[in-house]
């Protein structure tokens, strides 16, 4: 590995990607546990719903990026964090399978938007770099 690989800028993107992966995967695991406590036979189905919602959020980022100005984008991402936190708290204390799945879908759709933003920003930085796979692999490993 060359000294370019260990640059301060690359390290910043590795940390950003790792944090996102850690938060996303940890929340997904916790969601599965919450659903498992309420309705164990439906964990896999509920997980497929939230992962589908995160894909929709991932795709929705393109619309946000294209049609919303820069200041509003930062405001939206900040609002998403607050909403996700509130939804998570509501979901944690709910005993209704339907409510948990609906709040989980909304929360993971917002995660999808945020994940798309994180990966987009990282890919813009890494576009002309030869070590993209190593960077993303390292970030994913750190996130787990």
Predicted regions and their residues:
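Pair of pore-lining "gating" transmembrane helices in MFS-fold secondary transporters
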Residues: 2-47
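Juxtamembrane helix-start elements in MFS-like secondary transporters
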Residues: 38-51, 100, 132, 136
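Cytoplasmic membrane-interface "Motif A"-like loop-to-helix N-cap segments
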Residues: 66-80
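Glycine-rich segments within core transmembrane alpha-helices of 12-TM secondary carriers
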Residues: 127-144
């Amino acid at each position: 590995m060359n000294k370019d690989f260990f640059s301060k800028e690359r390290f910043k993107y590795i940390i950003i990607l790792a944090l996102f992966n850690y938060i996303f995967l940890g929340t997904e695991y916790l969601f599965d546990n919450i659903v498992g406590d309420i309705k164990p036979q439906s964990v896999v189905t509920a997980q497929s719903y939230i992962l589908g919602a995160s894909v929709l959020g991932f795709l929705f980022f393109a619309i946000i990026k294209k049609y919303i100005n820069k200041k509003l984008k930062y405001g939206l991402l900040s609002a998403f964090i607050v909403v996700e936190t509130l939804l998570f708290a509501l979901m944690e204390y709910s005993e209704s399978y339907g409510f948990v799945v609906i709040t989980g879908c909304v929360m993971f759709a917002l995660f999808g938007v945020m994940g798309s933003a994180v990966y987009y920003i990282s890919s813009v930085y890494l576009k002309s770099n030869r070590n993209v796979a190593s960077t993303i692999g390292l970030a994913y490993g750190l996130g787990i």
